[in-house]
Every structure is written in structure tokens, then in C-alpha cells.
Amino acid sequence: MSGALKRKRSDEVAWSRRRPVKKPVRRAPPPRAGPSVRRGLPSLQIQTLVAAGDTMITVPSGGICSLIGTYARGSGEGERHTNETLTYKVALDYHFVATAAACKYSSIGIGVCWLVYDAQPTGTAPTVQDIFPHPATLSAFPYTWKVGREVCHRFVVKRRWCFTMETNGRIGSDTPPSNVAWPPCKKDIYFHKFCTGLGVKTEWKNVTDGKDGAIKKGGFYIVIAPGNVEFTCHGQCRLYFKSVGNQ
């Protein structure tokens, strides 16, 4: 009887009155940015620049500099709808073919391709010498060029690639003798590059064209230099961009 009426200790009473601790409920992580999440976001616009036939590009010694962010004002897929554009990606698919004059000699040339951002455009297209000042004795060695010290605040190299071309002293119309096989060489090559994360912002003047004079800030150029093997360029340059800012 005395055992049944035994009083509980005070610490046992306090322990029995404690509320059970609830474990925190784990919430599922937010869904990743898949197709269902991205469905509401506007897709990137695409502009394609074609170099073929009459628009074929000839790359002489010393190189060329050409505007690729050429977004005219309009409502089309490859046109800007506002006064600002953001270029995110660039895909280059070019076929380089050594000229007949270059094929007459046996040589190896290392060419370079740059994507250059112009922070302070002047209304006219910059030349290769404006961006990469160099003496005439280095015209055949573009891999040694650097952005000029006086214009380094204006021109920013976003991407840079080197490529190699070769000639063996024979042009395409030459026919080898029946008992001789000419080894192949890289007198024509496929040049493919796809770059992302560019983030090139361009502000446009209140005009409708997309040329150099229409750019207020942020020109986007491609520079190609052939080394000592001049060539022609055929193919496409595709730009992925968005129209942002005010109408």
C-alpha cells in the first residue's frame, strides 16, 4: 500500500509536464529552372549575318574589323524593338579558304579572331590599327598584337582565338602527275566557335538603322587577321540578344 501511494519526485513531475518537441518539417526545394519555369520568360532574339557569294569577306594582310551587333530598329526577329540591346551569345560558323595568290607559296600562317567591345564609339567603324596598333613589320604576326595603351579604356577584348592555315605552293586548279600524290594541307579550314556569357549592352540613338553611326554606346565588333596566309571567309555569324530598355 505504501508503495502504491509513494509520491513522485519533483523532477519526475517536471519532466512529465514537458511538451514534446516537434521536429521541423523539411520543405521541398524550389523547382529548378526547367522548361515549365522558363515558359513565362521571353526567348532570345536571333540575328544571322551571312557571308557568301556577294557578301563573302576577304581577309587581307593586316586584318579586317567589322560591326556584328547590327540591330536595325523594327519588329522583326532580328531587329531591336527598344533603344537598348543585350547580346548574350555568338555562334561563328565560317569556312576559311586561302586565296590563289597565297596558294602559290608554301607557308604556314597563324591567324587570330577577336570579339571586341567598343565602350566609346565615335560614329565611324574603328580600324584594326585603332584597336591593335602595331608596326608594319608585325602585320603577318597578329598573335603578337595587343590593345593599345591609349585606348585600353575604350576597347575590351571579349574573346580571342587562334587558328592555323597552310599552303603547299599549289593552287586548286593544279593537277598532280599520275604517279605522284600530293599530301593534303590546311589551305581551307572550318572555324566554329560558340561563346556564351558575353553580356554586351548597346545603347542606340533615335534612328532606325543599325550601323556604326546609330550606336550611342557599346559597339560590338569582330576582328580577323590572317597572319601571312590571306583568305576569304564564307559562312554565318549568329547573335542571340534581347531588346531591353524603353521603347
UniProtKB/Swiss-Prot annotation:
Motif (Bipartite nuclear localization signal): 1-28
GO cellular component, one term: host cell
GO biological process: symbiont entry into host cell; viral penetration into host nucleus
Biased composition range(s): Basic residues: 16-26
Location of region: Disordered: 1-39
GO MF term set: DNA binding; structural molecule activity
Record-linked Gene3D superfamilies: 2.60.120.20
Compartment annotation: Virion; Host nucleus
Disulfide-linked positions: none
Keywords: Capsid protein, DNA-binding, Host nucleus, T=1 icosahedral capsid protein, Viral penetration into host nucleus, Virion, Virus entry into host cell
Keyword check for DNA-binding: yes
UniProt entry tagged with the keyword DNA-binding: yes
Primary role: Encapsidates the viral genome into characteristic twinned ('geminate') particles. Binds the genomic viral ssDNA and shuttles it into and out of the cell nucleus. Plays a role in protection of the genome from degradation, virus acquisition and transmission by insect vectors, infectivity, and systemic movement. The CP of monopartite geminiviruses is absolutely essential for virus movement.
The protein's assembly and partners: Homomultimer. Interacts with the movement protein. Binds to single-stranded and double-stranded viral DNA.
Family under the similarity heading: Belongs to the geminiviridae capsid protein family.
Name this protein carries in UniProt: Capsid protein
Lineage: Viruses, Monodnaviria, Shotokuvirae, Cressdnaviricota, Repensiviricetes
